[in-house]
Amino acid sequence: MAQRDYYDVLGVDKNASESDINKAYRKLAKKYHPDLNHEPGAEEKYKEVNEAYEVLHDKQKKAQYDQFGQAGVNGQAGFGGQGYGGFGGQGGYSSQGFGDFGDIFGDIFGSAFGGGRSRVDPTAPQKGQDLDYTMTIDFMDAIKGKKTDITYTRSEVCPTCDGSGAEKGTHPITCDKCHGTGVMTVTRQTPLGVIQQQTTCDKCGGRGTIIKHPCQTCHGKGTIDKKQTLEVKVPAGIDNGQQIRLSGQGEAGKNGGPYGDLYIVFRVKPSKEFRRNGTTIYSEAPISFAQAALGDKIRVNTVHGPVDLTIPAGTQPNTNFKLRGQGVPKINGTGNGDQEVTVKVVIPKKINDKQKEALVDYVKAGGGNISPQEKNFFERLKDKLNGE
């Protein structure tokens, strides 16, 4: 039976980079691996993929294949029907020379191939777990900052056994099953042959040691749960969803390792008066028709206190004014953001006779015609006042 083109087998072109060839191989090797794919023909496709990869990932073999085709690599591919022998070089699937071959099988079988991924020494010092704490604060506290106390529960080193987990005067002993490594080797029979896989020791639970006489305070854990009260400084300018890290305020470490960290996530309550986007504050200020037309100086609230705002004559409704430096403190810099004030021209729902008279005089003076109408503003105003 004619052999397929190796480039077609991997689904790459002749100009494919080494990285593209590796990616294609990893994908197909996982897809057709006999332990994962039990469909008819998967085993043959798996052999074909490996044969193509062994040639194309090797620069010398690839050059010979590109020049002479199959004749240039016959007898070199190493997959001449030897089956699924062992992985020590006796069978056709030796992991030697296959860049990320061991990684692929490591994904499938854990640490079975070439020792797998490195394991942490179970007796070495290990940093404790980090903790999260959500703090809800008022809008103005986020702007100005504050100090406040929080109480939470964390694990701490047992004061009785100093974290060993053993009763005072005794010590943990080395596990006789894993010899202190925390892992044991399990042998599996697969279509690829006998595979040795490392897994957590079922006697010591991966600790590498056994406690024969547990501490009565922590019951062998080496840690106790304890409530902790801390003073937290809320930074001025903190925003909703942002967090700060308090080093060493998390869970206790193992084997004398350092404590983890505490991350405080802030939830900021909304304000009825202000709206915030980053370091910019938004607010509204009501003004009368006369103030908009004639201009005025008004007092507006900012997050830092009231300030004067000059309204120029002829100000239109919904005009925005910027108050520089009246926004949120910049948490990672200096100075403040700005505040943008939108003026809202308030039209009175009811007016007295004198106000009506004044408006009529205003219209008579030519202040009413804004756009052509069948009736001018004065006529319509008269109709309105006369109830027509």
From Swiss-Prot:
Residue ranges of every copy of the J domain listed in the record: 5-69
Disulfide bond is among the record's keywords: no
Ligand binding (Zn(2+) 2): C175, C178, C201, C204
Any one GO molecular function term: unfolded protein binding
InterPro entries cross-referenced by the UniProt entry: DnaJ, DnaJ_C, DnaJ_domain, DnaJ_domain_CS, HSP40/DnaJ_pept-bd, HSP_DnaJ_Cys-rich_dom, HSP_DnaJ_Cys-rich_dom_sf, J_dom_sf
GO cellular component labels: cytoplasm
Pfam family, one: DnaJ
CXXCXGXG motif repeat ranges, renumbered to this chain: 158-165, 175-182, 201-208, 215-222
PROSITE patterns, per database record: DNAJ_1, DNAJ_2, ZF_CR
Note on how the cofactor is bound: Binds 2 Zn(2+) ions per monomer.
Highest rank taxon of the organism: Bacteria
GO BP annotations, alphabetical order: chaperone cofactor-dependent protein refolding; DNA replication; protein refolding; response to heat
Family membership: Belongs to the DnaJ family.
PANTHER family: CHAPERONE PROTEIN DNAJ (PTHR43096:SF48), DNAJ HOMOLOG 1, MITOCHONDRIAL-RELATED (PTHR43096)
Function text: Participates actively in the response to hyperosmotic and heat shock by preventing the aggregation of stress-denatured proteins and by disaggregating proteins, also in an autonomous, DnaK-independent fashion. Unfolded proteins bind initially to DnaJ; upon interaction with the DnaJ-bound protein, DnaK hydrolyzes its bound ATP, resulting in the formation of a stable complex. GrpE releases ADP from DnaK; ATP binding to DnaK triggers the release of the substrate protein, thus completing the reaction cycle.
Free-text domain note: The J domain is necessary and sufficient to stimulate DnaK ATPase activity. Zinc center 1 plays an important role in the autonomous, DnaK-independent chaperone activity of DnaJ. Zinc center 2 is essential for interaction with DnaK and for DnaJ activity.
UniProt xrefs under HAMAP family: DnaJ
Subunit structure, interactors included: Homodimer.
Entry protein name: Chaperone protein DnaJ
Gene from which the chain derives: dnaJ
